[in-house]
Amino acid sequence: MKVEEMDVQKYLDRIGYQGQVEVSLACLARLQLFHQMSVPFENLDNFTDRKKVLKHEALYEQIVTNHRGGWCHELNGCFSWLLEQLGFTVSVISAQYYNPELGEFCKVFDHMVLIVELAAQKYLVDVGFGNISQPSEPIR
């Protein structure tokens, strides 16, 4: 089975990341912040006939090549691929967020986040939440 590869440098350029890339918490935090500052949450495709494709190559083309944003499944999906290419151990999981204005949780499977394992510790990473209160660094 062929391992998918991406142009990692092009992705790092897209998010404006410069400097050393290593499998560390400090690097993960910087990658997360740079991604959030450069790639917007957007759901413009909901208003078109464009079919959502969640394969790595399609997400990369949308976010990196075409300089678009996306929703949580697209943003976290593409970011997980970048992290894997850099050597991080990543799991993709379903999540629910709490909406304080409505006083309730969102629907099950309505959100997607990443779990990154570093030195036997697990960190929640989310670059795909369209809200100002989105965590800007990994949460242990």
Task: Please report, for each region that a protein language model flagged, where it lies by residue.
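Generic preference for flexible, low-structure residues
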Residues: C27-L28, L44-F47, K51, K55-Y60, ...
